[in-house]
Amino acid sequence: MKSSEPAPATPTGFRNSIWFIIFYLFVIQALGSAIISGGIEFAIAYAMYHSRVDLITLWAFPHTISGDCALSLFIQVGLTWASEEILVGFDDYKRPVFRLNKWITKPSPLKTESNEEIPPPKKRFIVDYFESKDNVVAKQNTLYHKHNWLFGYLEVNRGIIPKGKEATLKGFLTSQFIHDSTQSKFMNFIEWFVQKFIRSMILAIAMFIVIWPVTMGILAGIGHKVGSHDYYFNDYPLPQVMKLIYAVVIAFVCTPVAIIVIVLRNQFHEELYYEGLANGTLQQDQEVCSTGNRSSGSTDQDISTTKQQSQEAVA
C-alpha cells in the first residue's frame, strides 16, 4: 500500500482537545449518570429504610448498610457499563466522540515507507503496554499476543469502525451483538453479556477495594455506636443521602472508565484494521469477525467503502 492511501480517520480541532474530552467525560456523561444513579439510589434507600422498626445498622442484619453499599456498587457499575456500551458505542459508530491520538496513538504504519524517522509518542501511558520499543509494524502479530491482556480487556477485535452518514441503528446493534455469524442471535447476546459482565466486574472489584472501605469508615464516624462493634442510623435522611452521594461517586469513576474503554477499543481496532490492509493481511480474529459481520450484512463489503465511511464520520 502506498502512503497516499487513506489512513484511519482522526478527529481534529476542538473534539480532539483535552478540554473537550474532560468536558465530555465528566460533565456530559458522568454528571448525567450521577444524577440518574443518585436519584434511583435515593428512592430505593427511602423505600428500604424509611419507617423501619428494626435498627438500620452498619453491619448487622436485616438492615445492613455495608451489605447494601457493596451490592449497589457492583450492580451500578455493571448497568453503567452496559448502558455506555450502547449509548456511547452508537455515538462513536456514527462519528468518533473523541480519539486519544495525541497521547496514545501508535505511529502509523503508512509512514514506514518514507525515510522520515517516526518520533516516539510524548505520553506513553498506555503505549508502554501496547507498543514495542522500536515501533516496527512487522511485529504487529507479536505485539498482539505479547500484550493480549490489554487487547483482551479492551476487546479490540470487537471494535467498530465509524460509518458516518451510512450509520444505522440496526447496523450498530448487529455489529455490537453479532460476533459469530455461525451462532444464533441468542448465543451471541449471551456471549456479549458475559464479556461485558466480566470486564465491568473487574472494574467494580478495583473500585470496591478503595471506595467501600472509605465509605464504611465515614459511616462509622457519623453513626451512633451500638454494642461493641456496630453503629445504627436514623431511618431518614442519612441513609438516603448517603446512598445518593455513594452513587454519585461511583458514577464519576466508572462512567469515564467505561467510555475510555469503548473509545480505545474502536481506536485500536481501526488502527490495526488499516495496518493489516497496509501489510496485506488482517489479524486473524479481526478477519474472522469481519467475515462474520459481512455474512450478517452489517459491515464492510468493500474496503474502499469502509475507508470513505470512516473519513466521512469525522468530516
Swiss-Prot record:
Keywords: Membrane, Transmembrane, Transmembrane helix. The keyword Transmembrane helix applies. One of its GO terms (cellular component) is membrane. Residues 288-315 are annotated as: Disordered. The chain crosses the membrane at residues 18-38, 202-222, 244-264. Signal peptide: none annotated. The keyword Membrane applies. It is a multi-pass membrane protein. It is found in: Membrane. Pfam families: DUF2456 (PF10445). Present with 830 molecules/cell in log phase SD medium. PANTHER family: FUNGAL PROTEIN. This is Uncharacterized protein YHL026C. It comes from Saccharomyces cerevisiae (strain ATCC 204508 / S288c) (Baker's yeast). The lineage of its organism: Eukaryota, Fungi, Dikarya, Ascomycota, Saccharomycotina.
